[in-house]
């Protein structure tokens, strides 16, 4: 909702929920999510080999595999999914920020990126499915 509302002023929250459910119904999305969550869980349990354990536990900025896994989701909806994801990864609104800054033994190195990817893909799906409803910022200036 947060990503697409400025471009689709009449957007309803229920449309966003439907779009998220559609994204979550895809096998590729399932595979990315279960892989990322499993890696986060194994990291919490200290079961990865070094140096991977340290890298994932610290969410090292140059690791990037967490973003690569997220790209497998956003790429389902083309360049708009990709740019939406970049925006969400940068500003980290709402739950994405909470997941990214979680402490106390929890590892969300992959989860925050996967949640952002699902949101970005759902926003991209809305834009692709309703191109006539999308308000273009350049056209309005």
Residue ranges of model-derived segments:
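Short, structured interface segments that constitute the first stable element of a domain
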Residues: 34-52
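N-terminal interaction modules that seed assembly of large macromolecular complexes
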Residues: 1-40
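Alpha-helix boundary/N-cap detector
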Residues: 11, 15, 24, 64, ...
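Phosphoinositide system proteins, centered on phosphoinositide phosphatases
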Residues: 48-85, 90, 94-98, 104
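Short, hydrophobic/amphipathic alpha-helical patches that form generic packing surfaces
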Residues: 3-4, 35, 69-82, 117-121
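Glycine-rich, aromatic-bearing surface loops/beta-hairpins
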Residues: 81-141
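Short amphipathic alpha-helical patches
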Residues: 22, 43-47, 100, 138
């Amino acid at each position: 909702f947060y990503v697409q509302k400025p471009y689709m002023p009449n957007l309803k929250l229920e449309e966003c929920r439907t779009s998220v459910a559609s994204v979550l119904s895809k096998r590729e999305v399932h595979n990315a999510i279960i892989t990322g969550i499993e890696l986060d869980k194994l990291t919490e349990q200290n079961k990865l080999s070094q140096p991977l354990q340290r890298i994932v536990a610290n969410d090292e900025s140059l690791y990037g595999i967490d973003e690569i896994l997220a790209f497998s989701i956003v790429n389902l909806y083309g360049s708009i999914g990709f740019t939406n994801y970049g925006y969400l990864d940068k500003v980290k609104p709402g739950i994405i920020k909470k997941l990214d800054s979680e402490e106390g033994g929890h590892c969300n190195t992959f989860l925050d990126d996967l949640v952002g990817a699902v949101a970005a893909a759902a926003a991209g799906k809305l834009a692709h499915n309703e191109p006539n409803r999308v308000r273009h910022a350049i056209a309005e200036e």
